Amino acid sequence: MALKIRLRQHGRTNRSFFRLVVTDARSPRDGKYVEALGWYNPVEAEDDKKLFFKADRIQHWLNLGAELTESAASLIKKTSPEIIRAQTEKKLNSLAKAATKRKKKD
C-alpha cells in the first residue's frame, strides 16, 4: 500500500479548511484515511491559528515510506522546515550512494 501525506478538504462553500492526513495513494481526496496529522485553515486571520501539524508523527510516517504531496510539503515547510530538510538530505545521500556504486562498477 503506497501511502501519501496530503490535504483532505472540509468545510462549506467559500469557507474551506483542510486536514493533513496519511492515506492510501489510490483513495479519493476526501476518502478514508489512516491518521490525521494536523489541519490548515486558510480563512483564519491569525497566523498561529492557521496551521497546526504534528511534526513527530509526520516524521514517523515519512520514515515508514510515505510521500508528501507538493501542497502538503509547502505547508509543512512553513511550520517545520527541519522535516523537509531531513527528507532532502536523505534523498541526496541515497543519490550520492548510488552514484558512487555506479562509479565503482565502471
UniProtKB/Swiss-Prot annotation:
Pfam families registered for this protein in UniProt: Ribosomal_S16
Any one Gene Ontology cellular component term annotated for this protein: small ribosomal subunit
Keyword Cell inner membrane appears in the UniProt entry: no
GO molecular function: structural constituent of ribosome
Alphabetical keyword list: Ribonucleoprotein, Ribosomal protein
InterPro entries tied to this protein: Ribosomal_bS16 (IPR000307), Ribosomal_bS16_dom_sf (IPR023803)
Organism domain of life: Bacteria
Entry keyword annotation includes Transcription regulation: no
GO biological process: translation
Family: Belongs to the bacterial ribosomal protein bS16 family.
NCBIfam families recorded: S16
HAMAP family xref list: Ribosomal_bS16 (MF_00385)
Descriptive protein name: Small ribosomal subunit protein bS16
Organism: Protochlamydia amoebophila (strain UWE25)
